[in-house]
């Protein structure tokens, strides 16, 4: 049950601290839609998505009106399409991608994920064909999101697919160059990808998730920052306790939305993702929380320490507020989506190397990083390999969403607008990892994988 006091606190957090729910995401299984005939699969898929998500926009609007709580995005996550299209030609795959995008537009769904593949071990020809279709799929759509999982702690790392993905990302950038290579913002590479992630671009409906489920992603960095503004001289343990209490309140709001959305749509409740997700708005920034904790500028020494503390406190507070938690659950540090992170880059305090260190203690990884358009494909692959290694050897989810902005050089600005924000093109290490990446093969799982 939710008390009147909790609802009043939620309303106050909305008014004073930019609290919102980042997304209600409906996960939908497409296994019963599969067919060797592409058009039949598309028709079946369309009926299934309309059945479960046809009323998503209206229900989200109802919840906004009922609680005065903004819901930023309405999203859908599908069974990984690569699992259902083994026999399809390249052209058939693009028809499926276009059909998914058209359904999303028709239902006014902001983003739809699941044009995805998992390639932990062998990189077979069917999967290679599917991954090769991603650049054209993203270039010809507006709302479709795509992801590839290249390793797990139990399976190791697939360097063959990582080597290919450097070229895929360059190709996406080239094919969406008229929009500052925006297609790359809808593609992410994962290690240990969760099956119930409500956030894009990496959301898909995992094979064990049932016919459908609702997952909710919270936001609320502004709430935490505002609470810390009253703790200027507090000890670090008091800071930790304050963050934990605020995370509890934010997550209760997410649980409230999850409960009502489940009832209104008649879809089982999935999880609340305990992630603080920033927006480009001033005062809604993870970087500003870290600076409120005591950093002069995010990216300076102490940033990894402060972020680790924030991440752990958010999880502990959130876990008390919702029984079913999952997804990515932590603090997000997407550069272009966080006005404070952008300022850190512009000031020269926040580098790619420091971001990589910070990703070892928080949710996801190198996210919404804009790099020069002439970066070599092997350098992108090596960025991915570094980040995936952090995930595999620390048994956590990590990811890379990098934008090699076509025609842009270091220091230029790219503006995606909306939630994706803007960023300066960051400097990169120009030494070549080509010989390492071209070795290919599989990296065995680490010894911590032997847990039975």
Curated annotation (Swiss-Prot):
Coiled coil: none annotated. InterPro entries: UPF0210. Pfam families: DUF711. Homodimer. Belongs to the UPF0210 family. This is UPF0210 protein Csac_1314. It comes from Caldicellulosiruptor saccharolyticus (strain ATCC 43494 / DSM 8903 / Tp8T 6331). The lineage of its organism: Bacteria, Bacillati, Bacillota, Bacillota incertae sedis, Caldicellulosiruptorales.
């Amino acid at each position: 049950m939710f008390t009147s006091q909790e609802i009043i606190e939620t309303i106050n957090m909305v008014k004073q601290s930019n609290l919102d729910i980042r997304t209600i995401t409906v996960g939908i299984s497409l296994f019963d839609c599969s067919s060797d005939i592409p058009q039949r699969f598309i028709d079946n898929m369309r009926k299934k998505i309309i059945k479960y998500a046809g009323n998503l926009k209206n229900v989200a609007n109802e919840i906004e009106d009922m609680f005065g709580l903004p819901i930023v995005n309405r999203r859908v996550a599908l069974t990984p399409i690569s699992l259902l299209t083994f026999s399809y030609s390249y052209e058939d795959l693009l028809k499926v991608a276009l059909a998914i995008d058209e359904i999303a537009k028709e239902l006014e769904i902001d983003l739809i994920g699941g044009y995805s593949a998992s390639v932990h071990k062998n990189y077979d020809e069917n999967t290679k064909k599917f991954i090769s279709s991603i650049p054209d799929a993203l270039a010809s759509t507006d709302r479709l999101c795509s992801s590839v999982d290249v390793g797990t702690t139990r399976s190791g790392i697939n360097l063959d697919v990582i080597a290919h993905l450097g070229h895929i990302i360059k190709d996406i950038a080239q094919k969406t160059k008229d929009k500052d290579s925006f297609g790359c913002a809808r593609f992410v590479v994962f290690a240990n990808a969760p099956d119930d992630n409500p956030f894009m671009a990496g959301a898909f409906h995992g094979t064990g998730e049932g016919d459908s489920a609702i997952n909710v992603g919270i936001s609320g960095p502004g709430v935490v920052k505002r609470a810390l503004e009253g703790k200027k001289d507090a000890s670090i343990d008091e800071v930790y306790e304050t963050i934990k209490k605020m995370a509890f309140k934010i997550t209760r709001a997410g649980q409230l939305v999850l409960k009502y959305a489940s009832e209104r749509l008649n879809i089982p409740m999935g999880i609340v993702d305990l992630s603080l997700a920033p927006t480009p708005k001033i005062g809604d920034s993870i970087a500003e929380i870290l600076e409120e904790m005591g950093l002069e500028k995010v990216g300076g020494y102490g940033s990894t320490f402060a972020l680790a503390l924030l991440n752990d406190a958010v999880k502990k507070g959130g876990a008390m507020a919702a029984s079913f938690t999952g997804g990515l659950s932590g603090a997000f540090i997407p550069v272009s989506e966080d006005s404070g992170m952008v300022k850190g880059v512009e000031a020269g305090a926040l580098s790619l190397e420091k971001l990589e260190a910070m990703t070892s203690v928080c949710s996801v990884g190198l996210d919404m990083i804009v790099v020069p358009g002439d970066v070599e494909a092997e350098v992108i692959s090596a960025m991915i390999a570094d980040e995936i290694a952090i995930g595999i050897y620390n048994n956590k989810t990590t990811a890379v969403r990098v934008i090699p902005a076509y025609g842009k050089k270091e220091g230029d600005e790219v503006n995606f607008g909306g939630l994706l924000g803007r960023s300066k093109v960051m400097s990169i290490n120009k030494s070549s990892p080509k010989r390492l990446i071209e070795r290919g093969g599989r990296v065995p799982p680490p010894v911590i994988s032997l847990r039975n």
